[in-house]
């Protein structure tokens, strides 16, 4: 089992150091463990941060908020940015090669595949006036 709390904090600190113009706020509960491959977490965190950083380029007061909490027996990782969001069909966002910018369009589809292949769940909430939120639910 991996200490997801500690892993979250490592990525948060790394991105805070490298992107000091973006406010990164976090609320991470301590000592929450998950059965998951560390390399998958690497893919998930790096893609989520990359997407948010690209979305926040022209946003005033760019902010990323990350939380990790335990509700019942589930761990819920929430990743939010106050970028422009997306008004189209949310299902498009997880289709391979779909992109709203000049990129491969593989990031969210890869995250979704990793999450669902491991029998976990991912929810996306977004629109053009309230940013982008992704919630990953790790079932115990």
Where are these regions (language model features)?
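Short conserved segment of the HATPase_c
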Residues: 86-97
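Detector for a conserved hydrophobic position within an alpha-helical segment of the HATPase_c
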Residues: 111, 115-116
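Short beta-to-alpha transition helix within the HATPase_c
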Residues: 2-17
């Amino acid at each position: 089992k991996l200490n997801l709390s500690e892993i979250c904090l490592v990525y948060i600190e790394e991105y805070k150091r490298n992107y000091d113009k973006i406010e990164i706020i976090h609320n991470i509960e301590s000592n929450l463990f998950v059965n998951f491959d560390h390399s998958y977490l690497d893919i998930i965190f790096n893609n989520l941060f990359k997407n948010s950083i690209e979305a926040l380029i022209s946003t005033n007061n760019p902010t990323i908020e990350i939380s990790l909490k335990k509700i019942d027996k589930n761990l819920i990782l929430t990743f939010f940015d106050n970028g422009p969001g997306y008004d189209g069909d949310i299902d498009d966002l997880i289709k391979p090669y779909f992109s709203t910018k000049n990129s491969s369009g593989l990031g969210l589809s890869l995250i979704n595949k990793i999450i669902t292949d491991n029998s976990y769940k991912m929810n996306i909430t977004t629109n053009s006036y309230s940013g982008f939120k992704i919630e990953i639910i790790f079932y115990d």
